Amino acid sequence: MKTAIIGKKVGMTQIFDEAGKVVPVTVIEAGPCTVTGKMTKEKEGYEAIQLGYEDVAEKKLTKPEKGHLDKAGVGYKKHLKEFRLEDCASVNVGDVIKADTFKEGDKVDITGISKGHGYAGVIKRFGQGRTPTSHGGGPVHRHAGSMGSSTDPSRIFPGKKQAGHMGVDQVTVQNLDVVKVDPELNMIVVRGAIPGPKGGIVYILSLIHI
């Protein structure tokens, strides 16, 4: 059965595998999450569950959020997220999902908001090369170069890579291996990097694409 959980990125470290090789890993504080809603094919036309993560004061919720959570009777939660799962029959509103919903060896997709880098140039934003730094290169070493051509077309085509805002995008990293699960500490350790800064909220879902 596919499952999901909401967590918080703690940071990165490294461990050694059985062969003695260094493996970079990310530590995630996963759950506990409370099921705050359940969607069924009969009523909504699809199957899904909504999870709530982290308690929050009542005054920090909107009226629709407060009404929804009061109806569910699960307390007030700061983060709500809906996950489409194939079989939700065994899950009910009020159930608590913890880190042990995953096990070592599972493959997961993790979604988060990437780090913000502010206004960035084409070199940092897209990895473009610089112009020659000698022999009359001029003061344009980090510029984007020619864009609009001459009289025809006399404009910049849509999609041209230019300087602009970088980061703060929703990013999903797929097919990550779960290296370790610690139910007592609500910790999940995955191989590799995941999007976002330390303390950023991430959504962990069983692998969708193989």
Residue ranges of model-derived segments:
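Mixed-charge, glycine-accented linear interaction segment located at domain edges/termini
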Residues: 200-202
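Conserved small/polar residues in nucleotide/adenosyl-binding loops
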Residues: 208-210
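Glycine-rich phosphate/pyrophosphate-binding beta-alpha loops
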Residues: 196
